[in-house]
Amino acid sequence: ALSGGTYANLRTQVHKVEREYRPETRPLGEDTLADALDIIRRWEHGHCRFDDCGLRDDRVDEEALLLRRELEVTGIVLYLDGRPTAVSAGFFLAPGLFDLAVAKSVSTAQGVSYYAKRELFRRLDCAAVNLEEDLGIPGLRQMKNRLCPAAKNEIWEARPLWNG
């Protein structure tokens, strides 16, 4: 439960989704895979690329879902008013520790990404969730900070001191 003042903003956004839409959450499976892949493919990439090598975050997500059995990926697809809107999925790194590897939404409605994550997390038996790196993207970093993390790891980047 998101109790206490720390989570007031998250509760407000989640309740807004519940008030303004008919949300339905379905487990990621054979019957929802096509919808999940469609969400990932329709997701706006913006500048979410890894440096200059042309790798795209959505391709990683797509592969994770296509290999969900081998990777033991579990997840949900969120439908708003009957339309596939968001997908959240990941896998356990250890007992009680879940890694959220896939989190995409095709809606600009406030609170949808929080709602989808909450719906996945409430189905899991875990004490902690790893949200992975934010790639230096300000909007993603802000969203993750609003989830009130218990801890953050410092990210380091190695660069050569010479050319050649």
Cite the ranges covered by each PLM segment.
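A short linear-motif detector with a strong N-terminal bias
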Residues: 2-6, 54-57, 109-110, 136-137
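Short, conserved active-site entrance elements at the starts or edges of catalytic domains
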Residues: 31, 35-84
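Short, hydrophobic/aromatic alpha-helical segments in well-folded domains
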Residues: 13, 39, 61-64, 116-120, ...
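Short, contiguous, pocket-lining structural segments
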Residues: 5, 9, 28-32, 70, ...
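Aromatic (often tryptophan-rich) hydrophobic motifs at membrane interfaces
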Residues: 72-163
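Glycine-rich loops and low-complexity Gly/Arg-rich segments
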Residues: 15-19, 49-53, 124-126, 153-158
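Acyltransferase donor/substrate-recognition loop-hinge adjacent to the catalytic core
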Residues: 1-51
